[in-house]
Swiss-Prot record:
Catalytic reaction(s) noted: Hydrolysis of proteins to small peptides in the presence of ATP and magnesium. alpha-casein is the usual test substrate. In the absence of ATP, only oligopeptides shorter than five residues are hydrolyzed (such as succinyl-Leu-Tyr-|-NHMec, and Leu-Tyr-Leu-|-Tyr-Trp, in which cleavage of the -Tyr-|-Leu- and -Tyr-|-Trp bonds also occurs)
Gene that encodes the chain: clpP2
Keyword Cytoplasm part of the UniProt annotation: yes
Protein name per Swiss-Prot or TrEMBL: ATP-dependent Clp protease proteolytic subunit 2
Organism: Chlamydia muridarum (strain MoPn / Nigg)
Cited CDD domains: S14_ClpP_2
Length: 203
């Protein structure tokens, strides 16, 4: 069971308790800190849409510490990021692997960050294939289609040729923070909030 801390604020009308994620949302901060599943994606998407409705011009910050997860769930978050009218600042803290790396790279160019000891990883999609021979063929075709989509997205986000993305993704391809800059996955390594362009997290 995941423990969620609560914070207490003085509202002027008394004290109000809220979970830490709701408090962060007030500062337009969204956290992806686990495997990317459909329920998580729906929660993140709802948060992003809420923040867009609150102010469609103000930056949103997404902090990522995720081993990856389901492709369709990750793509749903990716499409929502692209749908927003505001800039989205992405941060890797810990790890951004697989779909986590794709979402990290999807931030607004110039505003994609990683902390010094972060690790990033890209690889090709995989899945257990069972069923009849016809089912196996259909599922294999779907995996190839998803592989093409993911490679094209990463190529667009990083500036790397699609062929290089495909080649590098054949196996788990790990990068440190500085290597991720060279690859085009992020724009800057930061060790302090003051080093970012994000006014919402710098007091």
């Amino acid at each position: 069971m995941t423990l969620v801390p609560y914070v207490v604020e003085d509202t002027g009308r008394g004290e109000r308790a809220m979970d830490i994620y709701s408090r962060l949302l007030k500062d337009r901060i969204v956290m992806i800190g686990q495997e990317i599943t459909e329920p998580l994606a729906n929660t993140v998407i709802a948060q992003l849409l809420f923040l867009m409705s609150e102010d469609p011009t103000k930056d949103i910050q997404i902090f990522i510490n995720s081993p990856g997860g389901y492709i369709t769930a990750g793509l749903a978050i990716y499409d929502t990021i692209r749908f927003l009218g505001c800039d989205v600042n992405t941060y890797c803290i810990g790890q951004a692997a697989s779909m986590g790396a794709l979402l990290l790279s999807a931030g607004t160019k110039g505003k994609r960050y990683a902390l010094p000891h972060s690790r990033m990883m890209i690889h090709q999609p995989s899945g257990g294939i069972i069923g009849t021979s016809a089912d196996i063929q259909l599922q294999a075709a779907e995996i190839l289609t998803l592989k093409k989509h993911l490679s094209n997205i990463l190529a667009e986000c990083t500036g790397q040729p699609v062929e290089k993305i495909i080649e590098d993704s054949e196996r788990d391809f790990f990068m440190g923070a500085e290597e991720a800059i060279a690859y085009g996955l992020i724009d800057k390594v930061v060790s302090s909030a003051k080093e970012t362009k994000d006014k919402n997290i710098v007091s």
